[in-house]
Design a protein with these regions (language model features):
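Conserved catalytic-core segment of nucleotide-activated headgroup transferases in glycan assembly
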Residues: 1-74
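A donor-sugar binding/catalytic signature common to diverse glycosyltransferases
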Residues: 92-138
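Donor nucleotide-activated moiety binding/catalytic core segment of transferases
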Residues: 68-109
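Short, glycine-/Ser/Thr-/acidic-enriched flexible segments
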Residues: 22, 64, 113, 131, ...
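Class I S-adenosyl-L-methionine
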Residues: 66, 130, 193-194
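Short, hinge-like loop/turn segments at secondary-structure boundaries
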Residues: 75-77, 125-126, 143-144
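Short, well-ordered coil/turn elements that cap or connect secondary structure elements
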Residues: 52, 83-85, 119
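Leloir-type glycosyltransferase catalytic cores
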Residues: 137-225
Length: 225
């Protein structure tokens, strides 16, 4: 297993693939995969056959993975069989935003890392269903096979993404997270405010922003973007 600091010493272009937890309901319910290894096998096989030979693949484990599945050994063995072991790097450390920033694009199932990549104007390929898997923002089946993405990654339409992001922030998200005391406190407080509001799904202060964003979003969708 290599470290992120060592990987950065090379100037070769690379794609970034963040792993998700096997217990993630987004994987179990909204993707064609049951096990994360199945997705890894698809990505490695496609990369071996269709990516430019000078291109590398950086795979990062999920920071909350419990280690019961040895993804490092699985990736090593599979990459060796495909003859691309020297082009595939698996890490468990390092900054995800930095990995996105240096990449040519991001391949994933449906991780929220996709939103981080769109924020950085990076091409994103989704192998599963996701709220952000929208034509003009990402590439995916049935329009674009993964085999094509390696050589023709497309950056997201930023006006479309900004409109999508405003709607998402106003109607679907609350501040906070599930992984820290501060994050949980913020999430509870913001959720209570959302439920107590007479407009549960649309707070009055956000109404004007959302309507403007919907108009922008519709404008781009009319042109098939």
């Amino acid at each position: 297993m290599e470290r992120w600091a060592d990987f950065q010493k090379s100037d070769d272009p690379y794609f970034f693939y963040p792993l998700q937890l096997v217990s993630d309901s987004q994987v179990q319910l909204y993707s064609p995969y049951v096990r994360v290894q199945e997705a890894i096998a698809d990505v490695l096989t496609s990369f071996a056959l269709h990516a430019h030979p000078k291109t590398r693949l950086l795979i990062k484990n999920h920071p909350l993975d419990n280690g019961l599945i040895n993804y490092g050994e699985f990736i090593k063995g599979f990459a060796e069989e495909l003859g691309i072991y020297d082009r595939v790097t698996y890490v468990e450390d390092g900054s995800t935003p930095d990995m996105i920033a240096g990449s040519r694009g991001v391949v994933l199932i449906n991780s929220t890392v996709g939103l981080m990549a769109l924020d950085q104007d990076k091409p994103v390929y989704c192998m599963g269903r996701s709220i952000y898997n929208i034509e003009g923002l990402t590439q995916s089946l049935p329009t674009t096979p993964l085999d094509v993405f390696w050589c023709a990654p497309k950056a997201p339409n930023q006006p479309l993404y900004r409109a999508f992001k405003r709607i998402l922030n106003a109607q679907a998200l609350v501040h906070g997270n599930f992984y820290s005391a501060q994050g949980i406190s913020l999430a509870v407080a913001d959720s209570v405010r959302r439920f107590e509001d007479s407009h549960v799904h649309l707070q009055p202060k956000h109404r004007q922003i959302v309507m403007r964003s919907r108009d922008e979003f519709s404008k781009y969708r009319k042109f098939g973007i």
